[in-house]
Amino acid sequence: MKKEVIAHKNPKSPISEVFRTLRTNIQFMNVSKKMKTLLVTSTFPSEGKSWVASNLAVTFAQAGKKVVLIDADMRKGRQYAIFGLSPKPGLSNFLSQVEIGNDGRLSEDVGNFIQATEVENLYVMTAGNVPPNPSELLVSAQMIGLIDSLKKVCDMIIIDGTPSELVTDSVILSRIADSTLIVTAHKITKKDALERVVKNIRNVGGNIAGVVINKVPVSAKKYGERYYYYGEDKILSGKSKKEANINKKQTSAGNFSFEDRLSNEGTYQNKMEQMEEDNFLRNDDEPFWVPEQQNEGENTSNEEILSDKT
């Protein structure tokens, strides 16, 4: 497992606490309707989408929730590398192989396509093989059947989607998910791009939980200027004075079924070789949460926080 999974590698770090705050606020967003599926998307690549999804999934699992993290970026999925798992079988294999009977039952056990992680309660469905038609697979009955099946045995399903400005996959998934979290990057994400993503999701009937603003400069007075990297993505996150008033909301195992594995979970032994970890996030990295509806009296706008470039 890569060190960018800060919530697991260093659960007492400030960044882990930020993700726990995000988890708590997501849980209490709508107490009348329990959220069980959350889609995480971005506008473009390198905004920290997969990093947010993986750490958020870990914090839900740490709270005792049975969590499945689905890597729905079938073009360029990263979750298998983040957690040190086999890249396949995964989502694309499930959607292309499994059939649904007239009674709604799946022809194969979902657990055959899901892998346990070294984090207790957390399972990952990797993206699988790169299919020729990812968008078509996501609108299939198999995708609906997958989510319905997982809802019966899991407390939380987090879907790591694609960048919404590049392909329509995440917009499609926003109709299935209970709500969508949009990850943006300070001084990188363009305002018009974010507006298009929000509009497209709403046009198909999707709900938006809010926006996480990533790569925000850390206050030099409070923490000192720091830049962090992992893989090819430069991550610069933290809390600046301008954002101070924003609310932070935040493998198949044997011959028994996935449902049985959830109720009889044992100690996971990681047999994968340690993957190369060139660079990683520092422990005190902090993303920000901008709720979909801000409280009255707040005058900090997305325009101030995101890129001032057009």
Enumerate the language-model features and the residues they cover.
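P-loop NTP-binding module
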Residues: 1-310
